[in-house]
Amino acid sequence: MNLPEYISKDEVKRICKELGLRDWSKLKEASVTEKEAAEILQIVNTKGMDIPVEDFKQGLEVELEHGTRYDDANVTNNHPILTGKIVLAHLKETMDYYKRLEVVEIEGDILKAVLAKDLKKVESKYKELVQAQQLLAKAIKEQLPE
């Protein structure tokens, strides 16, 4: 089955220009500036959720995987508003969504390294895992009542 391009690169270019952002259709790395994240957050956060810009920025960088990063999984063509809405939906589920995801992704990386018998990578990823778990534990603690 031949699927259409749902969001064109021209549309991504148009919206980026309108918002004063760099052209996200040309992004090679999933890297978003704090200024870009703040601009997009202001547009998509219509219900006024208390979302730290840094958390939203992390979400944007993760959710760009729904764009041009994987051509066979491209849904958004890196459209900044659609990507922002994906982030918003996940943060509505739980505000620590991306901290939890970071832990899971590192655990997956550790398994890959174990299967590849790459002990150096296992060690470095395990150190990353400890840091990610600490950040998640802190986020959970902050959500709990005193």
Task: Locate predicted features.
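Long amphipathic alpha-helices with heptad-repeat character
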Residues: 122-137
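Amphipathic alpha-helical packing elements
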Residues: 74-109
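Short linear, low-complexity motifs centered on an aromatic residue
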Residues: 101-123
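Short histidine
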Residues: 7, 28-32
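Short acidic DE-rich linear segments
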Residues: 143-146
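Intrinsically disordered, low-structural-confidence terminal and linker regions
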Residues: 1-20
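Flexible, glycine-rich loop/tail regions that form catalytic "lids" or insertion modules at the edges
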Residues: 21, 32-70, 81-83, 107, ...
